[in-house]
Amino acid sequence: MTAHLSYVEAVVVGAFQGVTELFPVSSLGHAVLVPALVGGRWAQDLSVSAHRSPYLAFIVGLHVATAAALLVFFWRDWVRILAGFFSSLRHRRIRTPDERLAWLIVVGTIPVGLAGLALEQLFRTTLGKPVPAAAFLLLNGVALYAGEVLRRRVAPVADEPAVPDAEQQHGDEASDNRLAQLPLRRGVLIGAAQILALLPGISRSGITIVAGLWRGLSHEDAARFSFLLATPIILAAGVYKIPELFGPLGAGIGGQVLAGSIASFVCAYLAVRYLTRYFQTRTLTPFAIYCAVAGGASLVWLALR
């Protein structure tokens, strides 16, 4: 991607990133597959596997915008969570649900943070290609469907200890209180599932929702915990690479980055608003079908080209 990237292209990519980052369909997998399937200049300019691609600087702005959308949508939760975190440090113990939820997010973020520092560039350069991305997208669909199947088998047993007052409690704060009842080790396991999202085609939100379902959470609570977990890691990934945005890779694309970031923010906000309502009554199955079909069809298309 060079300075000739049009504003229309920047807005389209930004909007696509904002939606696919939060929908359980893998933003990285689509970022690899869509340019390859479209071909032409898109395949050349929008490469995530090239080590010095300006597209990587563009993606930094989109990540920061997506994280900002999550912070705005969940701002009440983050006020309570941050207050709980600092309160626990001050008192040197965990006393309230907000304090416990804060530490669940901390311990759930550490594994993927360390893995990302060690493996992100390796995975992106070696696996950030169309065929691996299509294969992992297919596997993502299988994982989402398997999560639903296992959820139906274990739900009657798993829901009792994890969510004792689920039918009586309603609202965002009630959901946070239910999440705070998770043992810390379960928070680590659910958060560690994000490591798989370093693979192009595996969805961060999808795999953490599946992990939450396997550990006895409802769809609503699993999705909420997934989005709360995603916020610090997406923000950290963007902030960590901000020097690339203001370095040589970002030269000449400032306007496009701004346009794409605005589109990403708006679409990410609308996406999380929709999904938090969707998972109150619905499941991962439609996304599983989409990923399996899209991944399988992409493999066939790439093989026949």
UniProtKB/Swiss-Prot annotation:
Membrane topology according to the record: Multi-pass membrane protein
EC numbers for this chain: 3.6.1.27
A single GO molecular function term of this UniProt record: undecaprenyl-diphosphatase activity
Keywords from the named record: Antibiotic resistance, Cell membrane, Cell shape, Cell wall biogenesis/degradation, Hydrolase, Membrane, Peptidoglycan synthesis, Transmembrane, Transmembrane helix
GO biological processes: cell wall organization; peptidoglycan biosynthetic process; regulation of cell shape; response to antibiotic
Localization per Swiss-Prot or TrEMBL: Cell membrane
Residues spanning the membrane: 18-38, 55-75, 103-123, 130-150, 187-207, 225-245, 246-266, 284-304
Keyword set includes Membrane: yes
Catalytic activity: di-trans,octa-cis-undecaprenyl diphosphate + H2O = di-trans,octa-cis-undecaprenyl phosphate + phosphate + H(+)
EC class name: hydrolase
InterPro entries reported for this sequence: UppP
A GO CC term assigned to this protein in UniProt: plasma membrane
Family affiliation: Belongs to the UppP family.
Note: Bacitracin is thought to be involved in the inhibition of peptidoglycan synthesis by sequestering undecaprenyl diphosphate, thereby reducing the pool of lipid carrier available.
Record function comment: Catalyzes the dephosphorylation of undecaprenyl diphosphate (UPP). Confers resistance to bacitracin.
Protein name per the record: Undecaprenyl-diphosphatase
Phylogenetic classification of the source organism: Bacteria, Bacillati, Actinomycetota, Actinomycetes, Mycobacteriales
Gene that encodes the chain: uppP
